Amino acid sequence: MTYSDGTNSGFSRRNHYVGQPAVKVGSSNFDYYRKPEKSHGFAKRAAFFAYFPLLILWLETDLKIASGFDVIGGFAFTFLFTIVLSAVLVLLCSFSKRRGVNRGIATVLTAALTIWYGVQMIYYNVFGTMVVVSSVTNGGAGQAFNSIDMIMTAITSRIVFVVLLFVPLAFFIIFGGKLFDFSKVKLKGKLIVLLIAVAFQIGTVLAVGIDRDSSDTKSNYNLYYGELQQVAVCERYGLYTMQRLDISRLMFGYKANIRTNSKPKNKESTADEITKPEQKAQIMSADFSKLTKSTNNDELKSLYEYFDSEEPSYTNEYTGMFKGYNIIFITAESFSQYAIDKDLTPTLCKMYNEGFQFENYYSPAWGVSTTDGEYANLTGLIPKSGVWSFSKSAENNVSFPFTLGEQSRKLGCKTVNAYHNHTYDYYDRDKYLTNIGYDYSAIGKGLDLGENVWPNSDLKMMQKTVDDYINSDSFSVYYMTVSGHGGYSYNTMSERNADLVKDLKYSDEVKGYLAANIELDKAMEYLLARLEKAGKLDNTLICLTDDHYPYSLCLLYTSPSPRDS
């Protein structure tokens, strides 16, 4: 029945609720309105609030497993430290009154996080370290992926983990609209979310400080407040926290504690004290006590006091052994004892057995991979974490008077050259090698190897450069090789020497590593032959070391050496 004013009869009723939109239900003849279910809306909002913490935890866990990190040990810290980031991301997706806009922002943020974690996963797989801000700003991350083969091989080797990274993004795109509430969050709600997140952050930071008195460099406190150890921090606290610490230290600076000698220096036992008749104390003429009093700079004072507190070193039976010798210093890419084999690399084996064998010699992956290894080799110093130490030193015109290059020039050496068989400005080598006294040549700067391959041949580099100095009265030469670079399944040098290792009972990667170092062995064979022919072999000191261990073959260190089989 319908009244003259057009309203319905009493068979249908309208129920209106203050503050809630009415929802029409039923047929055209029997319409009624019901109140929306509050619990359903609350569940969708709660699900959205939980989405970003779970997303980041998923990405962190996938990255850790793919990188071989301990997942359980740092699980709690990783999760708790991401709550603030998660809260910020949720609020960024809740500012607009239009739900579609908020959902679009959430999709973009999810994609950005996924891609960034993927980049870090592949970068670590190739270089054994994480991308830090300085690598991005210096263009190093872009330079690093200088070969599409390198990228594709790294992705292929971690394809399962790469696919898993994109699972949350696919899930969000397909089901996000049904499962989550993207409506705007009121100011009061935003403040509550932020306060809860900050409370978790403060509590987690306090928990980190519990072992602040620990001397362990890998303690929770030292990892968080000490020198940034990218990989260790990423394993314990997660990638996000590592990036946050890196950015904060870049923006606000970081002052490390300078270690001082706990033993008081005996002022009477300096140059006049000789423990044995033939030993002499090696002491500079600098008066550090006077220098300490002459400056108001606290950092300089700390350094002067530290140097003044140190006991001098003394001459020994090796002092002066190589006086007047020519020097060839070689930093061999990813070199290790596993590349030394009497059958595969006989020249390296000969050099090892007839030369000095250093024990307790450790070479880490470093924070910035090869260039940090070079920095340690050529300066004798530990590189600063989070920056390109060698590049920065050249940029700031830092003097290194004790490097081989500078000392060789001081002693009147006629030829002081450095060579690299890759792009000349990679890692800014053209700046820092010249800054420490070398005349530098590389691909694109005076060195042409006649082929464009990755990596280039160490043998060809020797063949193209030895004539530059072999006839000089005295020379000091530095080489940075590249044939042993990781990615041995596609390494051109591995392929070039593949027939020599094909029958070994190892994985293709291990055989590729050995094959790549055969090219280094050929380079050493050529170098020694040229030195002998020129009559320079007996008065030339050759030092060969690595830039870092072969991190792309870290499992190699748990397997027997080829020469043990």
PLM ranges: what are they?
Residues 7, 14-15, 272, 337, ...:
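Intrinsically disordered, low-complexity serine/threonine-rich segments
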Residues 296-559, 563-565:
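Solvent-exposed soluble domains appended to multi-pass membrane proteins
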